């Protein structure tokens, strides 16, 4: 059954709390574009009955393609929650999946690895002691800067998949990714340390349990209700004029990353991962979040969602996490410091490296989405973080 999402219209009325700040929000985004924090952006705000959905700027600083509300952004690590966490929530609902199980129960090749004892619940809350990331591209680059032809090709073949517009990676490279993960060591188990490694394994976990590949499982369980407007590898079904580019990759792919996922590890997995890989517009992402948080949601049991979005780290107020989801953080005296002091403790969300963020606060009836490509043309300068653009937006909203 498909749910028809109501067309978003801008309802501006002085009756609503933050509508008077719309001009200030527009000014902040416009000024950020002038300062080259990002060339363009989409913003979606729903608070009570007030909805504001607007696009700003252009795909790049050459000002050729204007951002429209249906254009797609690389969501980066937001994928961890609206693909990875959602998939596992659905496993809990449909397959009685036990998140307290060690991963060796589902990955036989981890039985001899010390990582095999790590529990799913700890991996989702980033307290399993896994290292943050592995720089897989460095294993593919020769000393002279050329890519190793054993795994990378500039020709499409039956045994490879798209890495970028010009490059292809062998289908079997995932085995190399998993092998390197298995060789890592644990450090400070029980302490918070953000890690994306387990999220690279979730597609295989889903396939092992359901017999369905990760992308189809998500489409059938969630994205079909949004008319498949959240998607992996958008270049397959969308013109590039509707996909916002991310970065001019001068380290690995040596080209503008456009239509393929920006995250290198996810790209080496063919663009389909729970670590990164989803593309969406702000409106489509907000509609998914709205459906998720309905009391009688057709997407997931509300009790499961509540469990996954509750704080799992009880002894560290500076690092509050749900199961995949980010939470409001506190200092020792109880004051909220991230992402905003007026958000409730039950609120949750996530950010993405490409310059994306969403936050949901049921108590304040708030859904906030900001999508940008702040890594364009390069990731070197983090102006989005340094200028606290997201925090300033929340200040105006709340």
Task: Locate predicted features.
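Bacterial Sec-dependent N-terminal signal peptides
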Residues: 1-24
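Short, conserved catalytic-motif segment at the N-terminal edge
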Residues: 22-75, 96, 179, 263, ...
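Residue-level preference for non-acidic, small/hydrophobic
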Residues: 29, 43, 48, 80, ...
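Short, P/G- and charge-enriched loop/turn segments at secondary-structure junctions
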Residues: 30-32, 72, 312, 342-348, ...
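Short active-site loop at a secondary-structure junction
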Residues: 31-42, 63-123, 184-198, 273-276, ...
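Structural recognition of the beta-strand scaffold that forms the well-ordered cores
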Residues: 42-44, 53, 122-125, 358-359, ...
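Short, surface-exposed loop or secondary-structure junction motifs
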Residues: 116-345
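Structured C-terminal helix/loop/strand segments within mature extracytoplasmic catalytic/sensor domains
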Residues: 350-398
């Amino acid at each position: 059954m498909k749910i028809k999402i109501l067309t978003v219209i801008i309802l501006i009325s002085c009756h609503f709390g933050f509508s008077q700040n719309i001009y200030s929000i527009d000014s902040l985004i416009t000024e950020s574009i002038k300062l080259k924090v990002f060339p363009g952006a989409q913003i979606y705000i729903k608070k009570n009955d007030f909805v504001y959905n607007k696009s700003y700027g252009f795909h790049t600083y050459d000002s050729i393609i204007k951002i429209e509300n249906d254009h797609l952004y690389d969501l980066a690590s937001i994928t961890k929650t609206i693909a990875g966490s959602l998939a596992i929530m659905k496993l809990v609902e449909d397959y009685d999946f036990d998140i307290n199980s060690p991963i060796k129960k589902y990955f036989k090749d981890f039985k001899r690895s010390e990582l095999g004892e790590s529990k799913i619940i700890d991996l989702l809350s980033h307290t399993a002691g896994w290292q943050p990331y592995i720089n897989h591209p460095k294993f593919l680059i020769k000393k002279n800067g050329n890519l190793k032809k054993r795994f990378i090709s500039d020709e499409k073949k039956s045994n490879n998949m798209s890495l970028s517009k010009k490059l292809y990676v062998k289908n079997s490279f995932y085995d190399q990714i998993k092998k390197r993960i298995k060789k890592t060591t644990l450090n400070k188990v029980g302490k918070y340390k953000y890690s994306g490694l387990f999220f690279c394994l979730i597609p295989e976990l889903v396939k092992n349990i359901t017999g369905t590949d990760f992308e189809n499982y998500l489409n059938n369980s969630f994205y079909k209700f949004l008319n498949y407007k959240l998607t992996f590898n958008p270049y397959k079904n969308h013109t590039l004029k509707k996909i916002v580019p991310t970065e001019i990759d001068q380290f690995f792919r040596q080209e503008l990353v456009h239509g393929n996922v920006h995250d290198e590890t996810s790209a080496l997995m063919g663009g389909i991962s729970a670590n990164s890989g989803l593309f969406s517009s702000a409106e489509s992402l907000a509609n998914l979040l709205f459906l998720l948080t309905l009391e009688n949601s057709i997407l997931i049991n509300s009790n499961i969602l509540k469990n996954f979005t509750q704080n799992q780290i009880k002894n560290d107020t500076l690092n509050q996490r749900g199961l995949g989801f980010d939470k409001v953080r506190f200092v020792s005296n109880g004051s909220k410091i991230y992402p905003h002091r007026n958000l409730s403790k039950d609120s949750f969300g996530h950010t993405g490296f490409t310059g994306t963020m969403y936050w949901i606060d049921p108590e304040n009836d708030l859904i906030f989405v900001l999508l940008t490509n702040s890594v364009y043309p390069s990731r070197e300068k983090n102006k989005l973080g340094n200028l606290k653009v997201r925090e300033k937006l929340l200040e105006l909203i709340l």
